[in-house]
Amino acid sequence: MAIRLILEAPDPRLRTISTPVEAVDDELRALIADMFETMYDAPGIGLAAIQVGVPKRVLVIDLQEEEDAEGKPIRHPRVFINPELFDPSEEQSVYNEGCLSVPEQYAEVERPAVIHARWLDEQGAKHEERLEGLLATCLQHEMDHLEGILFIDHLSRLKREMVMKKLEKARRARKAA
């Protein structure tokens, strides 16, 4: 396992449309292990393969919503290979979203509150599930990455430009430090 470099906006590779996974094999499982290690290290709750420079339709999510007796997050890692969404609800929900590729920037994004999804796991098993709440939002956010879309693309032009200016200012400050 290895921690990989997370691409940051405005890196043009983030705009790449990811291709379907042809085979669930040990090479893919190694990528998935690296993705989890990278996501936990960042820290984050979701990561798409394109964010580490691999244009494949793979993403990992772990909401880590529970804690153990010592206050450490309880991990519930989930792998989504070639995910598909269908039958989104008309009802919308709004979450204050962030992104490891747009570090330290957050904005409210409206998405369907309930979705249905189908995908393969890291063993190649098929799954289909109704998702809601933060998991539904996170899956939609990560699936946007597979299409070359960032959460800031859901914002008005003015808000998007403000986020990008803040991002560039923070990047310059990190380099100067």
Swiss-Prot record:
Active site: 142
Keywords, in A-Z order: Hydrolase, Iron, Metal-binding, Protein biosynthesis
Gene Ontology process terms (BP): co-translational protein modification; translation
Group of enzyme by EC: hydrolase
Pfam families, alphabetized: Pep_deformylase
Keyword Iron annotated: yes
Disulfide bond among keywords: no
Cofactor(s) required, per the database record: Fe(2+)
Cofactor note: Binds 1 Fe(2+) ion.
Annotated Fe cation binding sites: 99, 141, 145
InterPro entries: Peptide_deformylase, Peptide_deformylase_sf
EC number(s) given by UniProt: 3.5.1.88
Catalytic reaction list: N-terminal N-formyl-L-methionyl-[peptide] + H2O = N-terminal L-methionyl-[peptide] + formate
Single Gene Ontology MF annotation: metal ion binding
Family (UniProt): Belongs to the polypeptide deformylase family.
Record's function text: Removes the formyl group from the N-terminal Met of newly synthesized proteins. Requires at least a dipeptide for an efficient rate of reaction. N-terminal L-methionine is a prerequisite for activity but the enzyme has broad specificity at other positions.
PANTHER family: PEPTIDE DEFORMYLASE
The protein, known as: Peptide deformylase
Organism: Rhizorhabdus wittichii (strain DSM 6014 / CCUG 31198 / JCM 15750 / NBRC 105917 / EY 4224 / RW1)
